Each structure stands twice: as C-alpha cells, then as structure tokens.
Amino acid sequence: MAHPKRKTGKSRRDKRRTHYKATLPQIALDPTTGEYHLYHRAHWYEGKLYYKGKVITDKTSVGEV
C-alpha cells in the first residue's frame, strides 16, 4: 500500500479543499402550474407529471388503461 513520504501541511491541504464547495440547487418556476422545481427534472402537480410546462403523464388515466 502507498504511504505518504512527507506530511501534508495545513496550508497545502486547505488550498486543495477550496475547490470543494456547497452549491445551491437551481430552482425554476413552471409557467403552467406556478410550481417551483429543479431544472431538467419532471415534477408532480395535482396528480399530473409536468416537464417543460407540458403534461407527460396523468395518474388518473394510468389506472384506466
């Protein structure tokens, strides 16, 4: 197994870790329903699955088929 030959200093360690940062998720507002959702994701609203403002699936019609 590999072992470090020298101790990694606090400064070097912290410089490396500066690139790991927490980011807020981007939230979009659906123009059709007015609901907030994540970008590039479908979302449920009143039993219907919406994507880009259009109905993809309706929960009530799935059981009738």
Swiss-Prot record:
Any GO molecular function: structural constituent of ribosome
Keywords, comma-separated and alphabetical: Ribonucleoprotein, Ribosomal protein
Basic residues bias (residue ranges): 1-20
GO annotation (BP), single: translation
Region (Disordered): 1-26
Keyword Secreted: no
GO cellular component, one term: large ribosomal subunit
Family: Belongs to the bacterial ribosomal protein bL32 family.
Protein name as annotated: Large ribosomal subunit protein bL32
